[in-house]
């Protein structure tokens, strides 16, 4: 009798633990940073990138949005399919090369890109700001040209606001890539 009472007393607790282990959390939706479709043109000259730096606060699996000047939100069910820093570090050189096709380049030793901000709101705009450093070697010294880049990209209205947000982030990275290319041309 005591065993039966004990088992009956534990039954609600066991059922509660079982209910907690079977979560109703939806599967995450994965997004990619999509570069523009490559043109069917011959390869452009390779640009020597020394570094493409991304702020740590956006290099998370979760998609980061900003809801005030000093507050960001990480969404647990809307995530990147790959690390965002890696996606940006892959996309920028490809896009720069596409933008340079057929243009005369300055003599460049190396290029560095330091992204300070890349975020925004789902119903507003994406902001990107970065510093582009183009290093050139002269006969006597290394010259560094530093360019500040800033742009806002509107987030299109869409049923899937995160897909529209990811597209705006992609467009912001493409705009940065265009600015890098513009500063490498004679």
Predicted regions and their residues:
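Short secondary-structure boundary motifs at beta->alpha junctions and helix caps
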Residues: 69-79, 139-178
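Surface-exposed helix-capping loop/turn segments at secondary-structure junctions
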Residues: 101-105, 181-186
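Sec-dependent bacterial lipoprotein signal peptides
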Residues: 1-20
């Amino acid at each position: 009798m005591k065993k039966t009472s004990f088992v009956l007393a534990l039954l609600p607790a066991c059922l509660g633990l079982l209910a907690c282990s079977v979560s109703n959390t939806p599967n995450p939706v994965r997004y990619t940073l999509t570069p523009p479709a490559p043109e069917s043109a011959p390869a452009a000259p390779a640009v020597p990138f020394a570094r493409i730096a991304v702020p740590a606060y956006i290099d998370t699996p979760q998609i980061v949005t900003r809801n005030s000047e000093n507050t960001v939100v990480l969404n647990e069910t809307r995530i990147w399919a790959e690390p965002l820093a890696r996606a940006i570090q892959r996309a920028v050189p490809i896009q720069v090369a596409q933008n340079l096709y057929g243009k005369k380049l300055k003599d460049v030793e190396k290029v560095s890109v330091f992204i300070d901000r890349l975020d925004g709101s789902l119903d507003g705009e994406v902001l990107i700001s970065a510093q582009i450093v183009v290093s050139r070697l002269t006969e006597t010294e290394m010259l560094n040209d530093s360019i500040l880049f800033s742009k806002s990209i509107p987030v299109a209205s869409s049923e899937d606001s995160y897909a529209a947000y990811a597209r705006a982030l992609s467009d912001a990275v493409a705009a940065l890539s265009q600015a890098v290319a513009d500063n490498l041309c004679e």
